[in-house]
């Protein structure tokens, strides 16, 4: 039984025909991860869009390029305003928290709450030691998680989609050694590339034997 299918890129909205195919084959179960730089098309049987946001406008543009935040903002608002009263339910925000944007989490929530249904967060998972984007386990990371939990308890109870228990897990290594998953439930998700080859050890890994692997012991809990 397939609970959900998530289509990632590259950029899936460069191939709306492929997105439409997934929506038809897995009605109300297909999610699309997009940077929002292309117009968001209304697909009848799509579950929802995950729109990647990397901070407030300044931080997002620093990471993704000048003007990208405004372009994504316009495409999201256009979709919501042109597709009926409940169109906002089709849009979820995905924020990958890293060393450059961790101070903007509240601002991201405030910026996007009025136009989207939910936000889901994860932490950047490095592929090498010393990755400058990795926010190390410790005081600053704990503070981010605690802030999210507090926001979830108060005004954003129905907006932050991560359960409290999952947020707590993000404070520490919870199941990996080096690039090897140990307690991670990778069995729950089948990740394949565009050729149908299984990606290992998880969806952010690769099917290529000699490719770099994510550092499981510093996992950002992006999938689970």
Segments the model singles out, each with a brief description of its role:
Residues 31, 184, 202-203, 223:
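Generic recognition of cysteine residues
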Residues 40, 200-201:
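A sequence-level detector of short linear motifs
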Residues 47-187, 192-198, 206-211:
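Radical SAM enzyme [4Fe-4S]-AdoMet core and its adjacent flexible, acidic
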Residues 206-224:
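Radical SAM enzyme core and accessory elements
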């Amino acid at each position: 039984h397939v609970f959900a299918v998530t289509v990632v890129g590259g950029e899936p909205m460069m191939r709306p025909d492929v997105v439409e195919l997934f929506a038809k084959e897995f009605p109300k179960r297909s999610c699309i991860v997009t940077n929002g730089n292309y117009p968001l098309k209304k697909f009848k049987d799509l579950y929802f869009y995950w729109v990647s946001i990397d901070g407030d406008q300044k931080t997002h543009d620093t990471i993704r390029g000048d003007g990208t935040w405004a372009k994504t903002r316009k495409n999201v608002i256009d979709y919501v305003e042109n597709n009926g009263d409940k169109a906002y339910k089709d849009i979820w925000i995905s924020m990958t928290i890293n060393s450059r944007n961790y101070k903007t989490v509240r601002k991201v929530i405030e910026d996007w709450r009025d136009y989207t249904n939910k936000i889901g967060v994860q932490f950047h998972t490095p592929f090498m030691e010393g990755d400058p984007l990795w926010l190390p386990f410790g005081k600053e990371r704990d503070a981010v998680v605690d802030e999210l939990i507090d926001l979830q308890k108060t005004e954003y109870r129905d907006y932050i989609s991560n359960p409290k228990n999952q947020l707590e897990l993000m404070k520490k290594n919870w199941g990996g050694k080096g690039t090897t998953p140990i307690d991670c439930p990778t069995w729950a998700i089948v990740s394949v590339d565009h050729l149908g080859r299984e990606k290992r050890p998880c969806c952010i890994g690769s099917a290529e034997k000699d490719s770099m692997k994510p550092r499981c012991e510093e996992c950002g809990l992006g999938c689970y």
